[in-house]
């Protein structure tokens, strides 16, 4: 910045010596802390460059992330379910519903819309407090979608298949039919569609074909909003982690060098890029663990009956817009 003229000189000098980028998740850093503490969490700003201008997407949002020591994906899902249920029950015991209904009524004529909005909140909160929430594998979800398409029970714009993943219309169908108004966990997605750090599932598809390998992960689908939480068990074995990194196109160490001491004369960035420290967490000792990330603004919008996430965030920044 230049004196009182308030002009900026733009340079190409790298402030951190190398290009660095906005944070898309704090998960990897939480994994470092869980080595010392059994349960860790953070509520942090997160940035995504998704070119999606929908009521469900913004480029900057808050995400609640947690990591725990566990060998069980069920335990991670239990934690998510109990956390959201407890939060909702406390909302029911508070006076916040009346405030939301009053705020929704402001500027509107008649009580019809307010009554409808009040019923909407009751339905959503009731669904979140029911127990237990259904859990279904990705394979079973695809089968249900394909059966529905063949029997004409549902018409999808995107044909459901193992390789193409679950589209929004598929998630809405699963949430509506399997959950019937309650949240639904979908587990064990294809390995090829998920990040490198996820632990393989304890079982594989019946035909055991390579393209049908799965990882121990889940998405939590909430009616209307759909995916709100994603989580998994993390790969804690150094050889398997580096193998997964290579298969995902990351420059991991060759197997013969995994247990070798790092060469002081060699830059770690030549071996594992910016993830050398992450591999070291496994190389020098790790334990089974898992965690999740919850889209905080999406959940707030669902609880408050707000249909567009851009109305939840005070200064929404999204694809094509960053006004302030």
Model feature map: region roles:
Residues 1-71, 272, 280-282, 301:
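Class II aminoacyl-tRNA synthetase-like tRNA-binding/catalytic domains
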Residues 1-10, 82-225, 247-287:
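Metal-assisted phosphate- and nucleotidyl-transfer catalytic regions
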Residues 19-21, 38-40, 182-185, 219, ...:
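Beta-sheet entry/capping signal
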Residues 22, 66, 141, 186, ...:
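A residue-level signal for conserved active-site and pocket-lining positions in enzyme catalytic cores
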Residues 29-31, 48-53, 72, 192-196, ...:
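Flexible loop/turn segments at secondary-structure boundaries
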Residues 35-37, 72-93:
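His/Asp/Glu-rich mid-to-C-terminal helical/loop segments that flank catalytic regions of hydrolases
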Residues 65-76, 224-227:
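A generic structural motif
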Residues 232-324:
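Active-site pocket scaffolds in enzymes
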């Amino acid at each position: 910045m230049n004196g009182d003229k308030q002009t900026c000189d733009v340079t190409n000098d790298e402030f951190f010596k190398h290009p660095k980028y906005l944070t898309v998740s704090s998960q990897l850093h939480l994994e470092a802390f869980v080595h010392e503490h059994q349960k860790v969490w953070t509520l942090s700003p997160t940035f995504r460059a998704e070119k999606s201008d929908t009521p469900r997407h913004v480029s900057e949002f808050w995400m609640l992330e947690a990591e725990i020591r566990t060998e069980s994906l069920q335990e991670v899902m239990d934690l998510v379910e109990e956390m959201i249920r407890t939060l909702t029950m406390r909302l029911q015991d508070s006076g916040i519903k009346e405030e939301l209904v009053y705020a929704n009524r402001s500027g509107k004529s008649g009580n019809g819309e307010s009554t409808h909005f009040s019923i909407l909140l009751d339905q959503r909160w009731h669904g979140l407090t029911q127990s237990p929430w259904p859990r279904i594998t990705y394979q079973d979800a695809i089968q249900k979608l394909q059966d529905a398409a063949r029997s004409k029970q549902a018409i999808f714009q995107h044909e459901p298949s193992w390789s193409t993943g679950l589209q929004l219309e598929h998630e809405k169908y699963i949430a509506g039919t399997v959950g019937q108004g309650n949240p639904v966990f979908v587990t064990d997605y294809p390995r090829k569609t998920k990040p490198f750090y996820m632990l393989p599932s304890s079982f594989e598809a019946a035909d055991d074909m390579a393209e049908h390998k799965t990882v121990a992960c889940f998405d939590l689908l909430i009616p209307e909003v759909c995916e709100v939480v994603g989580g998994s068990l993390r790969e804690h074995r150094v050889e398997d982690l580096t193998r997964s990194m290579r298969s995902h196109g990351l420059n991991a160490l060759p197997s013969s060098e995994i247990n070798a001491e790092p060469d002081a004369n060699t830059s770690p960035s030549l071996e594992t890029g910016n993830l050398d420290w992450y591999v070291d967490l496994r190389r020098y000792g790790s334990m089974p663990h898992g965690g999740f990330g919850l889209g905080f603004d999406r959940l707030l919008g669902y609880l408050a009956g707000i249909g567009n996430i851009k109305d939840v965030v005070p200064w929404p920044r999204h694809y094509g817009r960053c006004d302030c």
